[in-house]
Structure formats: C-alpha cells, structure tokens
C-alpha cells in the first residue's frame, strides 16, 4: 500500500475483529480497506516529539535522548536543572554522600541514601535507593526500597524488564 502510518491508534471495538491475531499490518489489514470502501475516519498529525516505546531497548534509548537533550521533549516533567545539569525535584531526598552522574532525573518521591549512586541516564521516582546501591541507564518507579545494582532496566511497581543487550 502507498500509506505510511505510525503512532497511537484509538479504535472502535468492532475494528479489532479485522486485525489478524498473527503478525499483521494496520494499514494493509484495516485502514487500506476502509479507505478503498470510502469509510471516513479521523486522524491527527502531530509535529511534536514522538518515539516508539515498544520494548525496553527503545524505552531506555528514548530516556537517554530526552535526558541528554531535554528540549527535545518539551512536555517532559523536568524541574529546572541544577548546577550539575541534573533534574532533581524539590521534594526528592538526596543524602550528602550520595552521588549523581549527569544526567539524572529524581522525582518528588525519590530518595538516595548514603553512598548510593545514580546515573548516567537514570530516572527515579517512588523509590528509595539504599546505601551503596547503584542505578544507571535505568528507569525505576514505584519500587519502594531497593538495594544492589540496577542497570539497563525498567523497574515499575515490582516488575523488572531488562534491555536485550544487558547482562544479568
């Protein structure tokens, strides 16, 4: 087909029956036939930041891009960067012996205890990083108290997904 279409699809439930359970193509299997049948549907063009976040590798790569260049995604909920160019929310708790390696985002519910380290490319909120723990190239959210090494992963509310090239 001549169409190129990506992004978020909001579908009526009856359209789901037209999508093959096996690997399929939204344009070829759903939108192309609809256009050929003269069916009208709405679309929206967005010139702002967009990224595929389909798997941990893409999610972490996008996190890295946004932390490295915050102007890329102007809707990112970053506070003003501090003098080290890290993004630390006012309510975040950072022990004076904790270390940050730029760039890092610490949300309002983030705590780094003594000798903990975060960064580069770490996003932490809703989590306490225990003494001597490390977080790098990772997104840690809603994990409560954590210890040890957290690298090349996304950890949310008790679930952890590792990047495909990360060693366990």
Could you say what each language-model-derived stretch is?
Residues 81-168:
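Structural signal for interior beta-strand "rungs" in well-ordered beta-sheet cores
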Residues 72-83:
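Short, flexible loop/turn segments with low-complexity composition
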Residues 1-74:
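Catalytic-core segments of class I nucleotidyltransferases/pyrophosphorylases
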């Amino acid at each position: 087909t001549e169409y190129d279409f990506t992004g978020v699809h909001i579908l009526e439930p009856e359209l789901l029956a037209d999508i093959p359970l096996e690997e399929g193509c939204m344009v070829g299997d759903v939108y192309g036939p609809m256009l050929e049948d003269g069916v009208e549907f709405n679309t929206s063009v967005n010139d702002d930041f967009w990224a595929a976040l389909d798997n941990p590798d893409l999610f972490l790569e996008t996190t890295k891009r946004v932390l490295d260049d915050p102007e890329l995604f102007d809707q990112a909920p970053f506070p003003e960067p501090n003098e080290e160019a890290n993004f630390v929310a006012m309510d975040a708790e950072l022990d004076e012996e904790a270390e940050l390696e730029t760039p890092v985002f610490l949300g309002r519910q983030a705590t780094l205890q003594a000798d903990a380290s975060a960064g580069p490319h770490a996003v932490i909120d809703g989590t306490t990083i225990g003494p001597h723990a490390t977080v790098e190239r990772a997104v840690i959210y809603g994990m409560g108290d954590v210890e040890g090494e957290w690298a090349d992963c996304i950890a949310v509310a008790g679930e952890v997904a590792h990047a495909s090239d990360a060693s366990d």
